[in-house]
């Protein structure tokens, strides 16, 4: 069966590099499913889970906090703002951080501070949802 070369990279590190049968991820306009031979595409990515079905039938789940996707017929590159392997997600920690960010939002004075905290809240909410879904055995 044909495969895709997949790279998931954050600003800090390469999270995944390998061959995959398909990739599912949260595109700007909705969920995207990428198979080998897909039409070239560039899209923004929403916060959520990137599901990679490896060539060996194993599965990788990676939370991304947003970023850019590039698709070529034989490759997928995810340039994520932040990327965390599913095994490293902690729902309780994400919920606690979200509560702290909500408090910061209540205390924010100017529009720039509010925008930064709102972006962080959106990312933390998506992270908590992704952690909950992965804990329940669902990825999408």
UniProtKB/Swiss-Prot annotation:
SUPFAM superfamilies: Epsilon subunit of F1F0-ATP synthase C-terminal domain, Epsilon subunit of F1F0-ATP synthase N-terminal domain
Family of the protein in this entry: Belongs to the ATPase epsilon chain family.
Subunit structure: F-type ATPases have 2 components, CF(1) - the catalytic core - and CF(0) - the membrane proton channel. CF(1) has five subunits: alpha(3), beta(3), gamma(1), delta(1), epsilon(1). CF(0) has three main subunits: a, b and c.
Subcellular location field: Cell inner membrane
Domain of life: Bacteria
Keywords: ATP synthesis, Cell inner membrane, Cell membrane, CF(1), Hydrogen ion transport, Ion transport, Membrane, Transport
Main location: membrane
Stored Gene3D superfamilies: F0F1 ATP synthase delta/epsilon subunit, N-terminal (2.60.15.10)
Membrane topology per record: Peripheral membrane protein
Record-linked InterPro entries: ATP_F1_dsu/esu_C_sf, ATP_synth_F1_dsu/esu, ATP_synth_F1_dsu/esu_N, ATPsynth_dsu/esu_N
Pfam families: ATP-synt_DE_N (PF02823)
A single Gene Ontology CC term: proton-transporting ATP synthase complex
Function: Produces ATP from ADP in the presence of a proton gradient across the membrane.
PANTHER family per the UniProt record, alphabetical: ATP SYNTHASE DELTA/EPSILON CHAIN, ATP SYNTHASE EPSILON CHAIN, CHLOROPLASTIC
Protein name: ATP synthase epsilon chain
Organism: Bordetella pertussis (strain Tohama I / ATCC BAA-589 / NCTC 13251)
Gene: atpC
One MF annotation (Gene Ontology) recorded for this entry: ATP binding
